[in-house]
């Protein structure tokens, strides 16, 4: 989009106070944010180092930074901060760690670490870990709401909350002892720091002269307060959001934060972006009519100049197998007729469990696909091993990292030895790593085991010393060679080819660390800082990003589709108790499910189809399914219903298979 429309231009130019840009789906909000940053630097005299733009994903931050770079002259963007909320929080903690009582090089615990630590606490305190996931979620919710352990304990209303609050108390104490933080702490700790230390708050407010926040409807209580504290009394900010696309209440997001802005900033200006640059008028009318069933503080109507468009198809299928077969055949047929690449097609669904059947059908028809939510790069065992070594180098107090690497490769140090080492370290109030070469450990362990532990510590101390030198990357490469990790992989992989692939991931990780160090603009980043950034990237990018333009039908949940767009979209499982989800019906939170359907609809550029099954297997029984209430809320004149006649879907599928066999035979000539 080379030129801005009048509403977009208004949002870019306004710098007279607080601004809310209510940006509908596909309305060009990224263009507004990036042009506004350029406008602030080039026309308003605000230096880039005093501008901070925050979003929720690394991918969005990267795209934003690249687009801003294309608008600025050389050197104009130096010092500009475009990052995620959690990256900003990490930077604040890194710079203010002493005031928070942390040592340099603190660790960031990922989901696996957090669950392992909570499980350990529950087994010690309650002789079992039943309900650890529920307790983990409760503690996460408390942190998002800025509730610390004493307050959680005081306000516990039932035995379950009391148990969670006690675990929370032990958990925070242990985290601090490990010199570690978790993902939620990256927001909680900066907020508490700013609230308790006016001098630090003043320092950071002076660093942030203008603040921009994307996807504001996804902020939780702690993120809202972090923004409010950074803004202070200056009131120079632009937030961009869409109340109709708030679909993350389950992880603490509060769409009401958009309404709170009007109370907290009475002079707030609101600019609505309603022109859509993505979808046909018909698709947008369906989206507008559907979402109008939700109550609104801000009324908006999306419109476009992309043509009227085809009818929206609603396809009834006899059962879930026929539904999956129908979608696969529709995609194959459209691909053959239009010659459009498979990557132009998206299959969206409410839950990952729906993917298996359609995946099998796509495989059967030899249709390539990309399944979002697969194994992440950082989730691979070899990468987790090396990351644990990195973490131990950065933070010798990280017991979780120590326990992961002590026997990778095998060092003949058994669980009994480690248990005795752990008990000794707890008595001495030191880390397990620090305890490995203490003389007093000999009173608890045979000399064979103390020698092995001390040998490991000497080796790691040497690596740490080398990493503090001029070439830490070479030191890490040497470490991998010295522990003979490649041989360990060959012993523990299904084939030499698998071992080679896993080893290539190890070298790739070290190269990523090298790139992080080399890209540091300020030149003051240490290897510890670079590892901290990698650990954070691990958590922010749980799934490996697909390469651009990857061939294959895109399969993903409705939640994962947010922010994406495709020419052809199929939304499967449009049934009561699937969309809307059963739990939402029971909890009377239908509005969020409606927003989820709205997000799905507005992913489509040209063609949209809904499918649902008349019957579905559930717990071994065949049940009747009711079409989703959301289908009844759509404008009937824009819908074309199919599959309501008496012809069995299976017969149609056989006919379709026969026709496609003929086409394939013709193509092979």
What role is predicted for each listed range?
Residues 24-25, 56:
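P-loop (Walker A) phosphate-binding loop of NTP-binding proteins
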Residues 27-33, 97, 266-269, 274-368, ...:
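Helicase P-loop NTPase motor core
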Residues 50-138, 151-155, 166, 259, ...:
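Conserved P-loop NTPase-based nucleic-acid remodeling module centered on helicase motor cores
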Residues 157, 341, 355-367, 380, ...:
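Conserved helicase C-terminal RecA-like lobe
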Residues 1, 638-669:
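Acidic, low-complexity intrinsically disordered tails
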Residues 2-13, 17-21, 32, 52-53, ...:
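Conserved helicase NTPase motor core
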Residues 40-56, 339:
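Conserved SF1/SF2 helicase motif Ia
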Residues 31-47, 63, 67, 228-230:
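Walker A/P-loop NTP-binding motif
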